[in-house]
A protein has these predicted regions:
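Surface-exposed interaction regions that form or flank ligand-binding interfaces
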Residues: 1-66, 73-78, 87, 98, ...
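Polar interaction faces of repeat-based domains
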Residues: 90
Length: 204
């Protein structure tokens, strides 16, 4: 009886190890599921961009700042992007203060995303006066617009389709004048060369 299962250290060690492996696998699967949309967005933006920064704060030229989800340089075109992952049927118009999304489990409302884009585009134009700048509000494929949508509002896949290309092995070469403009944008956004997101400001 000295080797009964409840007194067998090897049994408990193997059982504990097996349980740990299962929990780690479940946690990893959950992480993959939760971040799938985010990783898909990131991959798409990297594919279509000659240069890319994300989650930046830019000076607005009058002493304030504006947030920008993503700024994509492609050729001589700069796209100022507001990216939203909203599930369900989306109802919105340019003159509506509040937009609504009807998902499977809940009804979700959010402010009209078009109105803040003017200030964001203006801020980018101040930093890149020689570039053609356009605003786009992009929704992931989890959302759809059963009653139409305003100009400048697209699904991410629709926006990206004409810009998709074979995967690049390294940074895309761009003219020196564009690189200088881009460096100025990155400096204003506190993004180091070769990075996509701003540096965290340390608190002393």
């Amino acid at each position: 009886m000295g080797h009964a299962w409840y007194g067998n250290w090897m049994f408990w060690t193997l059982s504990g190890s097996g349980l740990a492996v299962v929990l780690i696998a479940l946690g990893f699967w959950a992480w993959l599921r939760v971040t799938a949309v985010q990783r898909g967005v990131t991959g798409t933006l990297r594919n279509i961009s000659d240069r890319l920064v994300r989650d930046v704060i830019l000076p607005d030229g009058i002493g304030g700042f504006v947030p920008v989800d993503a700024l994509v340089l492609r050729g001589r075109q700069l796209f100022v992007l507001d990216i939203r992952d909203v599930e369900g049927a989306i109802f919105g118009a340019e003159k509506m203060d509040i937009w609504t999304a009807m998902g499977r489990k809940r009804r979700y409302q959010f402010d009209n995303p078009i109105r803040p884009m003017h200030d964001r585009v203006t801020a980018v134009k101040l930093l890149a006066p020689g570039c053609d700048t356009a605003a786009r509000i992009l929704f992931t494929s989890r959302g759809h617009f059963p009653k139409g949508r305003p100009d400048g509002v697209q699904l991410l896949e629709e926006f990206a389709q004409p810009l998709l290309r074979a995967k690049q092995k390294g940074p895309v070469s761009i003219p020196d004048d564009l690189q200088s403009v881009w460096n100025g944008i990155c400096e204003a956004a506190n993004v180091l060369p070769g990075r996509e997101r701003p540096e965290r400001i340390s608190r002393s």
